[in-house]
């Protein structure tokens, strides 16, 4: 079952359809509804349309959303991705300064669903956690793109299973926004971005493969230092070593054709 398009979400039939969504599809649908509600309010849309979206959010229920979010960290679905992050931070030479220094480094966790994962308990980081819909008092409810540098800069950003949920037109903006929230680029002790995607986004996309991903990331100033791909999840750790290009442009083109391919891509015209 595909996620329900925004333009088709309003109305009783679509509310009934949403009941069948589970896991990642439910999370994506819930996030898109929150964005749709914000868009309607900002555009002074008729109150009836806003109430319809609110009704569907209530129909899904925050409890169901929270259960779906937490299930993403179950061992059978990739587990706590920050375990891999901490291992890489400790063993990758250019990032080992994070483990050597006694003062914890600042880490921003986007789409946080847990306050007791490995990055929160390892002692290496002061973790700031945000999510579109907080599931815990220590997780700030905030849209990542609305966070400002004035709120603080970070040594590292964890973006685990977040970019794939974002609308395609916002993915490049999110990567660019990461560069604005990281400490300035530094080749000796570089800030870093931990990017986690469902592996089919890389291994079974019509428009994306690992070479394409790394080529796109280079335009933002990111160099891949570690990677690991399992059947379900792809993990990447990038060092932030130079400022983004003034003009970032990467148009969609087919790299793996086939009827069974998905359409994941990061369109870049900035």
UniProtKB/Swiss-Prot annotation:
GO biological processes: rRNA methylation
A GO term, aspect molecular function: rRNA (adenine) methyltransferase activity
Documented EC number(s): 2.1.1.-
Pfam families: Bmt2 (PF11968)
Chain positions recorded as S-adenosyl-L-methionine binding sites: 111, 131
Superkingdom of source: Eukaryota
UniProt keyword annotations, A-Z: Methyltransferase, Nucleus, S-adenosyl-L-methionine, Transferase
GO CC aspect terms: nucleolus; nucleus
Main location per the UniProt record: nucleus
Locations listed in the record: Nucleus, Nucleolus
Keyword Protein biosynthesis assigned: no
Function of the molecule: S-adenosyl-L-methionine-dependent methyltransferase that specifically methylates the N(1) position of an adenine present in helix 65 in 25S rRNA.
Family assignment from sequence similarity: Belongs to the BMT2 family.
Name of the featured protein: 25S rRNA adenine-N(1) methyltransferase
Organism: Schizosaccharomyces pombe (strain 972 / ATCC 24843) (Fission yeast)
């Amino acid at each position: 079952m595909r996620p329900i398009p925004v333009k088709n979400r309003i109305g009783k039939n679509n509310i009934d359809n949403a009941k069948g969504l589970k896991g990642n599809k439910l999370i994506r649908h819930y996030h898109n509804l929150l964005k749709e509600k914000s868009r309607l309010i900002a555009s002074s849309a008729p109150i009836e349309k806003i109430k319809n979206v609110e009704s569907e959010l209530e129909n899904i229920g925050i409890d169901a959303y929270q259960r779906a979010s937490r299930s993403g960290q179950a061992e059978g679905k990739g587990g706590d991705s920050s375990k891999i992050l901490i291992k890489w931070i400790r063993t990758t030479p250019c990032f080992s300064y994070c483990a050597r220094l006694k003062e914890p480094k600042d880490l921003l966790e986007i789409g946080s669903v847990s306050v007791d994962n490995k990055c929160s308990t390892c002692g290496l980081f002061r973790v700031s956690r945000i999510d579109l819909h907080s599931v815990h008092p220590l997780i700030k409810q905030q849209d990542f793109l609305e966070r400002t540098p004035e709120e603080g800069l970070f040594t590292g950003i964890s973006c685990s299973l977040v970019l794939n949920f974002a609308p395609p037109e916002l993915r490049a903006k999110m990567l660019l926004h990461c560069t604005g929230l990281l400490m300035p680029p530094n080749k000796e002790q570089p800030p870093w971005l931990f990017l986690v995607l469902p592996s089919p986004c890389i291994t079974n996309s019509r428009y994306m493969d690992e070479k394409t991903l790394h080529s796109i990331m280079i335009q933002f100033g990111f160099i891949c230092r570690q990677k690991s791909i399992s059947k379900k999840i792809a993990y990447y750790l990038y060092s932030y070593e130079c400022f983004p290009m003034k003009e970032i442009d990467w148009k969609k083109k087919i790299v793996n054709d086939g009827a069974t391919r998905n359409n994941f891509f990061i369109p870049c015209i900035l």
